[in-house]
Amino acid sequence: MFVASPVKTNFNGVSLVKSPAFSALSCRKQHRVPISRQVRAVISREEKAVDQEDGKKSTNKPLINSSQFPWQRSKYTGSKTVTAVVKIRKKIKEKLTERFEHQLELFMKAIGQGMLIQLVSEEIDPETGKGRKSLESPVMGLPKAVKDPRYLVFTADFTVPINFGKPGAILVTNLLSTEICLSEIIIEDSTDTILFPANTWIHSKNDNPQARIIFRSQPCLPSETPDGIKELREKDLVSVRGDGKGERKPHERIYDYDVYNDLGDPRKTERVRPVLGVPETPYPRRCRTGRPLVSKDPPCESRGKEKEEFYVPRDEVFEEIKRDTFRAGRFKALFHNLVPSIAAALSNLDIPFTCFSDIDNLYKSNIVLGHTEPKDTGLGGFIGGFMNGILNVTETLLKYDTPAVIKWDRFAWLRDNEFGRQALAGVNPVNIELLKELPIRSNLDPALYGPQESVLTEEIIAREVEHYGTTIEKALEEKRLFLVDYHDILLPFVEKINSIKEDPRKTYASRTIFFYSKNGALRPLAIELSLPPTAESENKFVYTHGHDATTHWIWKLAKAHVCSNDAGVHQLVNHWLRTHASMEPYIIATNRQLSTMHPVYKLLHPHMRYTLEINARARKSLINGGGIIESCFTPGKYAMELSSAAYKSMWRFDMEGLPADLVRRGMAEEDSSAECGVRLVIDDYPYAADGLLIWKAIKDLVESYVKHFYSDSKSITSDLELQAWWDEIKNKGHYDKKDEPWWPKLNTTQDLSQILTNMIWIASGQHAAINFGQYPFGGYVPNRPTLLRKLIPQETDPDYEMFMRNPQYSFLGSLPTQLQATKVMAVQETLSTHSPDEEYLIELREVQRHWFQDEQVVKYFNKFSEELVKIEKTINERNKDKKLKNRTGAGMPPYELLLPTSPHGVTGRGIPNSISI
């Protein structure tokens, strides 16, 4: 029978009491909801007090006569009460119809028609040979008052036998027609409290009749899984793998692999793009969507309708705050591009910048219109006047923030010192390498690309280093010569890029040699720009900084072409490929092969947030055929082919960790006495110096964590889930690299620690360092043009005379047009923005406290957060050290990209847990 008894619960500062707000209506035949006599109605003390004041006697009569439901009678003689506190996150609802649906949902939950939950014990039921199960109980009652308005809290009570054992899993069935976001369930009895973290969307039973399985927070290895929930552990993993057939639906959480066959459209000649992930164009795998094919040879997937979003598993989708922030960025981008788009339409062409004030006006309210407003009184005049009229309303939308690179010194970008500094402390500080010998040699086929020796000869370099009072031999010996080399990655594409007719752009393959002076400044010595060779010429050109007006301007153009190369490689290789694309297979494999109970899953979970969604959005509108990257960056429609070529020639998992990458580039030397096992060649290398602090903190956390769960090598090799996970990453996720000998083995705790440290570094510190500086450095077009539209004029060229008359006009005419510039600036601003719901690396202790009921593990995360606080203090102190020329100086922005914390917005700082933008 039902027993009325007060039960109080308190978690996260929320006091809960149970309500008797249900009736016999809660058992509807069409759902056959079992309302058990084991479900107790619990009345608060306050309600009892009111009854007593009214002179009413409190009775224990049941609200529902259980004799009506004979199949519900308990077979248990000894029993105990277990209470479930269910926390649900509300959707942000704005429409009137949605509000009505919300109230209806509350009513349905109140009468027991919203959700059913069933406890599964860790103990085996001898009668079934499986884990003991409670009867299903409806989650009922009106929601309880909570401090956080985003959540609703409900309760359910169970009566289970004394020997039921500890609940290890909960089966959740959603009876509503819409999905429910389940935050957590807390199970309490007289002796214990067990947390079941969820943070997951529970599908409607109408979409899938299978109940969802939620496991307790305590992590355990497969071999340690309690017998009662072993079968559920495997069943849950199987449920997310899918069968590789059919189109995925929005409510599903299926993780599977596919090649990049959805970037182009073979039905449109100008949108044909190669499939990435085949022998000719190798690439990491993406998440499978199963959309229908539009062609079979090659097998290309439909891109769907323009506004239709690509599938990602339901729990990977942006939450409302993130989605609204992203939409706001797109809306702002629309307004950013509105005026130059109208100007282009009115003049029937895309307008170049003609003076630097055109660019300066981008950071003021009256952008572009002041230059492009038609003077006639017809339609053009009307539109121009109309736009001027709305400028007052949309000023904040039409105005760009001043990028950090020119905020305090408008002319810093012109100086060679700043050009060199950005190779160490800019948005792309990962390509500079130590120059160990001369001449520099190419690895390309000389029959196709000319002599392998660079034309940056010893004589040229010797002449330049003389200005610093040294010789070339001494400079090499003292490790003062450095190189940024894009020759081999770009030269195979240069002819094709320069032949693009729609939105034409021009490029070279560049090499730049730098000298690191004794006063701590890195300065460019010489630049080599190469075109494909012809029968008449090698087409290799050398430029050095000039001492007269002509060579001074030519040097500026040469540096601009280097920056254009750098911007393309940064975006397509270092940013997209090495963080976004390479991380996607790790996320897919983690969800397919590691149970949510697995300690490695729990460690990686915060570092996977939003990555699949942002990658899907990139395939939809950023890296696709005709997308922003193709429109606004040098490689154009060959962008993803270039990214594939880089994956083929240079990507190695074992070299993606920071120390290994620095050693590979010669920017650090192995030193067992150094804290991270490496010593920097340039101490004032802000990205590397700060990055090693972050790397070391991650490494220490991971090593402690791994040793906590794995005692020896045998525990690693015998973990079937772990071994399947690593095998799948190599053989499915990075299938095109599966036979490479450099893949780390997974036999020891040290192996696992190194693998996990690499992954977490890529998702957090590495992505932060090369992403959140995009607008601070790239928002000023002359500093970092993403493409150039003209080659450097030679004396025999028709453009040379114009260059001599007006070099500034020639320089600005080479930059992206106003529309191209504002397009890419808008994207860079969006990509550099922290969302209000960003989760930062320093906050891991808060995230992980929810996942663990293990004091020692919580201590590890607390120590990690404390270490990051110290690191932030250290970085701030470094940025004030006047001896560190690459961090501080007159008008120079400090290097803050690896500061752990940040407010939301475009800040140029902050390390999120994951690749979330």
UniProtKB/Swiss-Prot annotation:
InterPro entries linked to this entry: LipOase, LipOase_C, LipOase_C_sf, LipOase_CS, LipOase_Fe_BS, LipOase_plant, Lipoxy_PLAT/LH2, Lipoxygenase_dom_3
Primary location group: plastid
Compartments it resides in: Plastid, Chloroplast
Gene that this polypeptide is encoded by: LOX6
Gene3D superfamilies reported in the protein's UniProt record: 3.10.450.60, Lipoxygenase-1, Domain 2, Lipoxygenase-1, Domain 3, Lipoxygenase-1, Domain 5, PLAT/LH2 domain
Biased composition (Basic and acidic residues): 46-57
EC identifiers of the protein: 1.13.11.12
Cofactor list: Fe cation
Residue ranges of every copy of the Lipoxygenase domain listed in the record: 219-917
Cofactor note: Binds 1 Fe cation per subunit.
PANTHER family linked: LIPOXYGENASE (PTHR11771)
Single GO cellular component term: plasma membrane
Pathway(s) the chain acts in: Lipid metabolism; oxylipin biosynthesis
Superkingdom of origin organism: Eukaryota
Protein name: Lipoxygenase 6, chloroplastic
Single GO term (MF): linoleate 13S-lipoxygenase activity
The entry's keywords: Chloroplast, Dioxygenase, Fatty acid biosynthesis, Fatty acid metabolism, Iron, Lipid biosynthesis, Lipid metabolism, Metal-binding, Oxidoreductase, Oxylipin biosynthesis, Plastid, Transit peptide
